[in-house]
Regions:
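Residue-level detector of functional hotspots within protein domains
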Residues: 3, 10-12, 65, 108-109, ...
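Short loop/turn segments at secondary-structure transitions that flank enzyme active sites
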Residues: 47, 59, 153-154
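Acidic/His metal-coordination segments adjacent to aromatic residues that form catalytic metal sites
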Residues: 1, 54-72, 130
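Active-site-adjacent bridging/hinge elements
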Residues: 7, 11, 52-61, 119-121, ...
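Aromatic-rich carbohydrate-recognition surfaces in CAZymes
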Residues: 1-52, 72-80
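Active-site core of glycosidic bond-cleaving carbohydrate-active enzymes
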Residues: 28-39, 66, 70-105, 116-120, ...
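Short amphipathic coiled-coil heptad-repeat segments
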Residues: 110-115
Length: 183
């Protein structure tokens, strides 16, 4: 079975729109969508309440990618940003921001305690839910750029993680013919 769960992507795009056009009328109109999305994410992808979210085909690079219920960095980062901005939107439209601010803070704490590998300077791809509950340290590129894009890191973490990419992820050599020779 192959399909995508693009709720995270749609809501992330919607939140970026809100950052550039915080029209209170539109925020109010879309509030139920955001609220129901965050409830759905919590119910389906964080059923144990540890503030670390599972992921199933929820990013563009994720053809048949599933973590078997584990705690996944990229989906957790998206949910951090979703809750953080939901708290800000709630304040603007007169709703209670506390549940969203509390969840965002708990997500960030859980990410730092469980998924951040301090001695290597990057996030783990995920942590197993079952069995030995191993931390999978071989992170994909999206595991680095998503927390940075979502603001789920300190400036030092962002720097260290991008340095880890430079030093550890393989590169595909590309040679291009140009008027001055092969580049």
């Amino acid at each position: 079975m192959h399909h995508y769960d693009m709720n995270l992507n749609y809501i992330d795009e919607l939140l970026w729109h809100f950052c550039y056009d915080a029209d209170p009328a539109y925020l109010r109109k879309m509030w139920p969508v955001l609220k129901l999305h965050l409830e759905w994410e919590k119910r389906n992808w964080d059923p144990d309440g540890d503030h670390l979210y599972d992921a199933y085909c929820c990013i563009w690079a994720s053809d048949a990618l599933y973590y078997n219920g584990g705690a996944v960095t990229h989906s957790t980062a998206y949910n951090y940003r979703g809750n953080l901005l939901a708290a800000r939107i709630a304040e603007i439209i007169g709703e209670d921001p506390k549940p969203y601010a509390n969840e965002a803070a708990a997500i960030l704490k859980a990410m730092n305690e469980t998924l951040w590998i301090d001695d290597e300077g990057h996030w783990a791809e995920y942590k197993d839910l079952m069995g030995l509950k191993r931390l999978h340290k071989n992170a994909a590129l999206w595991t680095i750029y998503t927390p940075i894009d979502c603001g789920a890191c300190s400036p030092e973490q962002a720097y260290r993680a991008t340095r880890w990419v430079d030093e550890n992820l393989p590169r595909i050599p590309i040679k291009v013919a140009s008027p001055t020779g092969v580049v």
